[in-house]
């Protein structure tokens, strides 16, 4: 059975550094699992590795599409399966690294047999949102699918639009579609590594990293993106943390200090959601080994575990 390793963790938990250290020691191929780093032109605010860094440590599934495009979990699964197959064909073990928990869940537990995104219908729904307002679309969702509506925030634009799209495509409530989920039996021998840092240390790292991003030109990056004629604040890419707050600043809604403060708060909230996924939904799908990334002995412990896994799987992926 072919081998796969995952390195999962919240934002700013040190996944990339550890993944690269593993890459130097073992026959691995790095595959990004990040719903923001897939977009071209979104570099600073996503903490995307530099071109020079990627030349030394190549990653699949970075810079896959334009920020105006819709990139779904279904598309990720398709792209990830191709990247994993290529790694195995090259005699490498794929190391999936990133913090988009939905992508991991979809890849290892399967997706509902949902219709693909419909660009024309989505454009119509977004136009309707601008005329009727997001609260009206959420009220509709509450009416035809209260179960799914109560699982999300009333201002969750991305999911409200997607659920509206699914309902209009199929005539069925999204919760009913998700209940029909087809489980895909894992086809890999997998090792799942999870980084779970102390909360206060993670919060410090998030704040420090965001200030570093600002000093590196994050605001200017958002300004360049804002000049793209077809890109709006409602696109999934621009709903990413940091981008939506700085976009609001550039629109004159909030001052820069407030935008930075809100961005750091939103990033901490994202990390909390990621950790909740790790401790709940993903634990029901994956058998994970947890490590504190801020403990000095963690890298060596991870190296030992990966070495044992590689030795056990020697020859099975060639």
Curated annotation (Swiss-Prot):
Name the record gives this protein: tRNA dimethylallyltransferase
GO biological process annotation, one example: tRNA modification
EC number: 2.5.1.75
Superkingdom of the organism of origin: Bacteria
Reactions that this protein is recorded to catalyse: adenosine(37) in tRNA + dimethylallyl diphosphate = N(6)-dimethylallyladenosine(37) in tRNA + diphosphate
Keyword match Nucleotide-binding: yes
Organism per entry: Dichelobacter nodosus (strain VCS1703A)
UniProt region (Interaction with substrate tRNA), positions on chain: 34-37, 158-162
Binding site for ATP: 9-16
């Amino acid at each position: 059975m072919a081998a796969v390793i995952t390195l999962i963790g919240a934002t700013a938990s040190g996944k990339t550094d550890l993944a690269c250290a593993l890459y130097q020691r073992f026959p691995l191929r790095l595959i990004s699992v990040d719903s923001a780093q897939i977009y071209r032109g979104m570099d600073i605010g996503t903490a995307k590795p530099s071109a020079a860094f990627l030349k030394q440590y190549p990653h699949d599934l970075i810079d896959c599409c334009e920020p105006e495009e819709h990139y779904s979990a279904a598309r990720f699964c398709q792209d990830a399966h191709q990247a994993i197959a290529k790694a195995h064909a090259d005699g490498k073990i794929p190391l999936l690294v990133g913090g988009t928990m939905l992508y991991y869940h979809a890849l290892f537990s399967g997706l509902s047999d949902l219709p693909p995104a419909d660009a024309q219908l989505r454009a119509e729904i977004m136009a309707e949102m601008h005329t009727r307002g997001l609260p009206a679309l959420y009220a509709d969702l509450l009416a035809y699918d209260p179960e799914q509506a109560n699982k999300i925030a009333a201002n969750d634009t991305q999911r409200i639009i997607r659920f509206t799209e699914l309902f209009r495509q199929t005539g069925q409530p999204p919760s009913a579609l998700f209940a029909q989920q087809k489980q895909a039996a894992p086809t890999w021998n997998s090792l799942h590594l999870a980084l779970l840092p102390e909360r206060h240390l993670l919060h410090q790292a998030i704040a420090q990293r965001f200030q570093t991003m600002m000093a590196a030109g994050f605001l200017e990056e958002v300004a360049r993106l804002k000049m793209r004629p077809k890109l709006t604040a409602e696109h999934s890419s621009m709903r990413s943390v940091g981008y939506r707050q700085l976009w609001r600043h550039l629109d004159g809604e909030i001052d820069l200090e407030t935008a930075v403060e809100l961005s750091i708060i939103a990033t901490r909230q994202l990390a909390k959601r990621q950790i909740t996924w790790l401790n709940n939904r993903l634990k029901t799908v994956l058998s994970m080994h947890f490590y504190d990334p801020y403990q000095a002995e963690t890298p060596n412990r991870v190296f030992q575990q990966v070495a044992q896994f590689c030795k056990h799987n020697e020859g099975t992926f060639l």
